[in-house]
Every structure is written in structure tokens, then in C-alpha cells.
């Protein structure tokens, strides 16, 4: 029996948007961030879903813009003593688990993730205990405590390959927390997967009929879909994949127009990869319904320039990620399994 958190009835309060900044104010904060990064031996690690100006700043200062797997690798390999993680809290936790000797700062510790929020440790632990014969695989979008309960951690970029491997070993799987990604992986591999019923507030909003209408306006466009989207949306795709995989698909597909069903923060790097192509955001509303996320994670949007300055200036307290030693050691086991497995795929 599936453990079911009724996501559709769970309305997470969205955080306030960062204050509007003038062009001169943005320039002031960018220059200040550059100075602070140098002074503190810090490097920026930013996710594809952060705002374009944050991604550009990470690139300009020698940092990294990537998906959660590459963010983890970069932070693990970079010599800087401080990591400034521009993303959501589980990404900061992962960085700290992999780099306990480093100081890990975030613009705000209030940058949540609906997948993380929708998979509480207590309920998930009980779910796993109820199915002791299953191998527990959790998505990177989970808390350190949930990772500590898992056998494996996985990102969307290697999800199909990992589950295919475990299935070949005769393993039955508990998958958490994203039900859409879990169902997609089950369909791709045929594995015996029991899904936790979470969802991403951004990808869960993509609508089939609205996407069909946009495709009708651009019949020569390819449709790119992240597998956290509903299956009916995935069924319309010309390419399905993680953020990094979608960027590669944007480059390799012959189409000059691309309709993209993932967080629109990805457009910054995708347009860099194929500047000659037109990108269109897949609709997140339809049939008279308005969108809540409107194809951009509200928590990713909290990573503004002012917040980054505050994080670097204030350091601890509201900005530093701390993970208890025992919890870190438990969560490190499935994370290292993921990194070792991913390394074998290269």
C-alpha cells in the first residue's frame, strides 16, 4: 500500500519575492559579492533554476552552474574553504555532508523544496519500516534525515540507469519522493517500484491541453520535458531528461524552436548552449486555472543578490548549513554510492 500525502490538497505558503533592485544597485551588489568571495576564499555553486543574474555571477567568479549532481561533484572537488550554495536547502545540506571540513553558506536557509517538505522523516521512516524487503532509493531533493534512511540517493540524470541496475540485481524498490519521476522510471525500466506520493510544485503544474495548444501554434517545435512532470505531459515530449540532459537535447535536436517544460531558470544556460534557437516556456495553467509557480520555483527565486551579500557578511546563524556528525555519516553512505555509480557511467 502506498503512503500517500495528498499533494493536491497541500498548499505550501510561498516566500516573498526579493526586493526590486535598480541597475545601479545590482552592479553595486555584484561587485560587493565578488570582493567578499575573494576575501573569504569562497566559491559560488548555483543551480540551473536560480535567476539568470545569479547564474551569470557564479560563472563570472569561477563558480559552477549545474544540476544537483554536478553541484555536488564541483563542491567536493573545488579547493575553496567556503561554498556559497545558491539553490534550496537540501543542496546546501548535500554540500555539507560531502564536505564537512568546509563552511557551507546559503543566501537563506528558508529556501525550501516541495519534494523535501512533502517527505517528512517520521512518516517516511515508518513507510520504509513497513516494507523491509525493499531497497530504499531517494531523490536528491530530500532532507539529510531522509537520505540517512536510504540505501541509495539518486538524481534525475542517473535515475533510469540506477534503477535498471538495481532491478537487474533482483531488488524491489521504494522510491521517494517524486511520484511522477518514480512512475517514469518504472515505465522505462519495468522495475518493481513502490512510490512515495510527492510532487514538485513547478513540474506538477504543467498542463497537457495547454501544451497541445502551444504546440499547435509552433508545430515545428520540439517539446522538452523534465520527468518530474505528469506522465500525460511526458507522453508529448520529443526529449525527456534532467536539466543537464535537456540542455544537451536542446543542442542536438535539429528543431529551431523548443518548447521547454521545466523551470524557466534553465533558459539562461540553454540559450547559451544553442543561441540560434527560439525557446518557449511550456504553460503551467489552463482550462481557466491560474498557475501558482508559473514555471519558476519561488524558493529558488529567494537567492537574490542582497541575500547573497548577507550570507557572506553574516556567515553563521541564518546562513550556515550545519549537519550533526552522526546524521552526516549516515547520509554520506548513500550519497557516496550515488557518486561512485555515476562515475562508472562516465
Swiss-Prot record:
Cofactor details (free text): Binds 1 [4Fe-4S] cluster per subunit.
Protein name, UniProt field: Quinolinate synthase
Stored NCBIfam families: nadA, PRK09375.1-1, PRK09375.1-2
Alphabetic keyword roster: 4Fe-4S, Cytoplasm, Iron, Iron-sulfur, Metal-binding, Pyridine nucleotide biosynthesis, Transferase
Compartment annotation: Cytoplasm
Name of the coding gene: nadA
Cofactor(s) recorded in Swiss-Prot or TrEMBL: [4Fe-4S] cluster
GO annotation terms (biological process): 'de novo' NAD biosynthetic process from L-aspartate
Lineage of source species: Bacteria, Pseudomonadati, Pseudomonadota, Gammaproteobacteria, Enterobacterales
Record: residues binding iminosuccinate: 47, 68, 139-141, 156, 226-228, 243
Catalysis: reaction(s): iminosuccinate + dihydroxyacetone phosphate = quinolinate + phosphate + 2 H2O + H(+)
Organism: Photorhabdus laumondii subsp. laumondii (strain DSM 15139 / CIP 105565 / TT01) (Photorhabdus luminescens subsp. laumondii)
HAMAP family: NadA_type1 (MF_00567)
InterPro entries documented for this protein: NadA (IPR003473), NadA_sf (IPR036094), Quinolinate_synth_A_type1 (IPR023513)
